[in-house]
Regions:
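Metal-dependent enolase-superfamily TIM-barrel catalytic cores that perform enediolate-based chemistry
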Residues: 116, 120-255
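Metal- or metallocofactor-binding catalytic centers and their adjacent structured scaffolds
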Residues: 26-101
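Structured beta-strand/loop patches that form or line metal/cofactor-binding pockets in enzymes
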Residues: 1-36, 346-353
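Extended hydrophobic packing segments that form well-structured cores
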Residues: 373-399
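N-terminal amphipathic alpha-helix/helix-capping segment at the start of soluble metabolic enzymes
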Residues: 1-14, 103-117
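Shared catalytic-loop signature of beta/alpha-barrel
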Residues: 46, 51-53, 65, 232-241, ...
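Conserved, mostly hydrophobic/aromatic
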Residues: 3, 28, 51, 89, ...
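Ligand-binding pocket scaffold of soluble enzyme catalytic domains
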Residues: 21, 26-27, 32, 100-103, ...
C-alpha cells in the first residue's frame, strides 16, 4: 500500500487554528494526524509540503524507514519545526497502517495496558481569563476561580492544572513573560508575583476541595532563582506537580533537588537525544512528551528510556480532539504513565469538526477501540470554519 498524496487542512480554533494532515493511499485508505503551528512553531505546514514528494510512492507500512530517511535529508536542521513536520507525517502513516490492518493504533505500539487514562483539566481558568469571548463563563474575579474549581470537582475530574495570574483591582491578568506577555525578558519574579500565585492557588483549592489534585504550570516564565522563589512561596500547598521547563538539565536538576513538590518537564523537547541529559541528571519526576510533535512511534522510544531511568511520563496534549485521541492511544500503550493532559474548555463548534469526540468516566478518558486513531476531522465542517490569519502565540498583542 503506497502513499498517493498528502494534503494539509486548517480550520478556525478560536485563538488559534487547528491543523490536520490528510494522507491518502493508492488503496483509498486515508490516514490523519493533527499538528500545531500556534505554539511557537510557525512553518510546520511548509516543512510537510516540502517533504511530501519524498513520501509519495513509499509503502505506508514502512513508517520507520520513511521517518529515518526524512531525518537524514533534514539532519543539518533537525528538530524544531522540521522535527514537528516529521512527527505529523509519522502519525498520519500510523493511522493509515492501523486502518489497513483494521486495528486501533495502540496495537501498533505493543497493545494497550489500560482501558482508561486518568486526565487533568489543563489551562483551568486560563482560557476563561485570556479568551473570555470564546470560553464561558468568563472569569473576572477570584469568585470565578473558586466556581471553576468547584465545577472541576462536580464534573468528576480529579486533577486540574492552572497558570499564574496577577490580580489588579481584583481582576485576573495572565502573567507569562517567557512568552512575551508581558514583555519582561529578564524573567525576574518579584513579591507581587509570589503573593498572586498564592492567592490564585488558594482560590482554586477552596473551590475544588481537598481531593482534587492541583498542578501549576511555570514553564519558561522564570530563571532558576525565580523558580526557587515560587516553590518556596507555595511550599505549604499540596501540589501534584509543578511544571518547569528549563533549557539547562543541570539547572532543572538543581531546582528539583530543592523543590518541596514533584517537578514535571520537557514538553518542548524533540527526540530521545534531547531528553537524555534530563534523564541522566534526574532532573524531573515526570517527563512530559509531546507525541504530536515527536510522532507517537518515536515518542515510545522516549517512554522506554524514561523507564530505564525510573521516570514516569505524561503526554502533552492541549490541541483538538484528534490529537487527544492520538495521545489516548499513546497513553494506553505506555506502562510508565503518570497522567494525561487535556483541555476541557472547548469551542462551541469543536464537536462539529470531528466524527467522534472523547468520552470520560470519573475523570478518565476512555480509550477508543476502533481502527486507527478512533476519530477523523470532517472536511465539510472544516470548510464551514475557515482558518483565521495569524493564530496562536503570534496573535497575542504586546500589552
Amino acid at each position: 500500500m503506497k502513499v498517493a498524496g498528502l494534503e494539509i487542512l486548517r480550520c478556525d480554533a478560536g485563538w488559534r487554528n487547528y491543523h490536520f494532515l490528510k494522507l491518502t493511499t493508492d488503496d483509498s485508505i486515508v490516514g490523519w494526524s493533527e499538528f500545531d503551528e500556534g505554539f511557537g512553531s510557525p512553518g510546520v505546514s511548509a516543512v510537510i509540503e516540502r517533504l511530501a514528494a519524498r513520501v509519495v510512492g513509499q509503502d505506508v507500512f514502512d513508517h520507520e524507514r520513511i521517518f529515518t530517511e526524512l531525518y537524514c535529508f533534514t539532519r543539518p536542521a533537525a528538530g524544531g519545526v522540521v522535527g514537528e513536520g516529521l512527527g505529523a507525517i509519522e502519525n498520519a502513516l500510523l493511522d493509515a497502517k492501523a486502518k489497513a490492518l483494521r486495528v486501533p493504533c495502540y496495537v501498533l505500539l505493543g497493545g494497550k495496558v489500560r482501558d482508561r487514562v486518568r486526565v487533568y483539566w489543563s489551562h483551568c481558568a486560563t482560557w476563561r481569563v485570556n479568551h473570555p469571548t470564546l470560553y464561558k463563563p468568563a472569569i473576572t474575579s477570584l469568585d470565578g476561580v473558586k466556581a471553576l474549581g468547584a465545577e472541576v470537582r462536580e464534573k468528576g475530574f480529579t486533577a486540574l492544572k492552572t497558570n499564574i495570574f496577577l490580580y489588579e483591582g481584583g481582576k485576573p491578568r495572565g502573567w507569562r513573560p517567557g512568552f512575551g506577555v508581558p514583555f519582561l525578558p529578564e524573567l525576574n519574579v518579584d513579591k507581587d508575583v509570589l503573593r498572586n500565585v498564592r492567592t490564585h492557588l488558594a482560590a482554586m483549592r477552596d473551590g475544588a476541595g481537598p481531593d482534587v489534585d492541583l498542578l501549576l504550570d511555570l514553564n519558561f516564565n522564570a530563571k532558576t532563582e525565580g523558580y526557587l522563589k515560587i516553590l518556596k512561596a507555595i511550599a505549604d500547598f499540596d501540589m501534584f506537580w509543578v511544571e518547569i521547563d528549563s533549557y539547562s538539565a543541570e539547572a532543572l536538576g538543581y531546582i528539583r533537588r530543592q523543590s518541596p513538590h514533584p517537578v514535571s518537564s520537557c514538553e518542548t523537547l524533540l527526540g530521545l537525544r534531547e531528553f537524555l541529559p534530563y534523564f541522566r541528571e534526574q532532573a524531573m519526576d515526570v517527563a512530559i512528551i509531546d507525541g504530536v510533535w515527536n510522532g507517537v512511534w518515536q515518542a515510545m522510544t522516549i517512554v522506554n528510556a524514561a523507564e530505564a531511568f525510573e521516570v514516569n511520563i505524561a503526554p502533552h496534549n492541549f490541541y483538538g480532539h484528534l490529537a487527544t485521541m492520538m495521545n489516548a492511544h499513546f497513553a494506553a500503550a505506555t506502562p510508565n504513565l503518570r497522567i494525561m493532559e487535556i483541555d476541557i474548555d472547548r469551542l462551541p463548534w469543536d464537536e462539529e469538526v470531528f466524527t467522534v469526540v472523547p468520552q470520560f468516566e470519573n475523570g478518565h478518558l476512555v480509550v477508543p477501540d476502533t481502527p486507527g486513531w478512533g476519530t477523523e476531522p470532517i472536511e465539510e465542517a472544516i470548510k464551514a470554519h475557515p482558518p483565521k490569519g495569524p493564530g496562536g502565540l503570534l496573535h497575542y498583542r504586546r500589552p
